[in-house]
Amino acid sequence: KILFNINASPYDKNKNNERKNLISKRASEASMHVVYVNLVGGQDELIFDGNSMIFDKKGEMIFQSPEFEEGLYEAQINIEGIENKKELKKENDLYSIEEESIYKALVFGVKDYVEKNNFKGVVVGLSGGIDSALTLCIAIDALGSKNVEALIMPSRYTSKMSTDDARALAEKLKVEYKIISIEAPFSAFLQSLEPVFKKLPMDTTEENIQARVRGVLLMAISNKYNKLVLATGNKSEMSVGYATLYGDMAGGYSPLKDVWKTLVYRLAKWRNKEQEVIPENIIDRPPTAELRDNQLDRDSLPDYEILDPILEQYIELDHHPE
């Protein structure tokens, strides 16, 4: 007897090993061959990675399809217990490096979402920081540089280094980019609000106005050219509310929404090993939103090396805060 398991199991960085262990156990318990067939493709925020597998009745895996690739594969099964696999097994396609598998999942998700929703391309707000740099790389690897546009939107608080790094990244990736200063609309908002604010000291209100001005510019390009805005926020920031509603959260798809900040750095370094496109300044400098003078993320948050493990325990492992 052969058991066919037709599945639509979404991707998770640890799920493939969980699947293998569970299917192997069930196959050996039932003394039955198991053919596990999984969906490939993206559907909104979900990514289905494929990784279809065949296990013999001893619980040994005798075939696994490549990740994130549709295909028709063959494997011969001797129901007496002797497996005869064809060359289509392709074990070399299995990824031993976690960063490679996760990066490929992110690229696959962007590609499927954009194509299935018939967008003409995507637009990314490029700040000179690590999150937008990685998002731009993912977009280009998914869609090609001709279908990606970068928008650099400096303010009075944006350092020359940030603008230079953003331009260097865009030029290395051969992507079209435009520079639009937000100083004029930001100043106009401050002037309009001056009678209401009555000389109250500047705080996060003015910081959020800058982020929202950038969101308006990105959405204007999206509407005019039918391009999807890719939000660039990561899971660490979203989990603690270190983001601006209708500002940097604006976008139709967020590739890094389930990626911790520390993992963002790991993925950026991995991508640079393939081709060094992200300037070292972007990877090495302390993270900053640059919404006020001398601002650093660590002024408001613990270092991400400390914060991320805490958030992971609380959010993903459901541990009690105490």
Residue ranges and their predicted role:
Residues 31, 57, 83-128, 132-322:
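ATP/NTP-dependent adenylation/nucleotidyl-transfer catalytic domains that generate, transfer
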Residues 35, 76, 283:
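Residues in well-ordered beta-strands of folded domains
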Residues 68-87:
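A short, polar/charged loop-to-alpha-helix boundary motif
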Residues 37, 65, 75, 180, ...:
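Hydrophobic residues at beta-strand termini and immediately following loops
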Residues 1-70:
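CN hydrolase (nitrilase-like) catalytic-core segments centered on the catalytic cysteine
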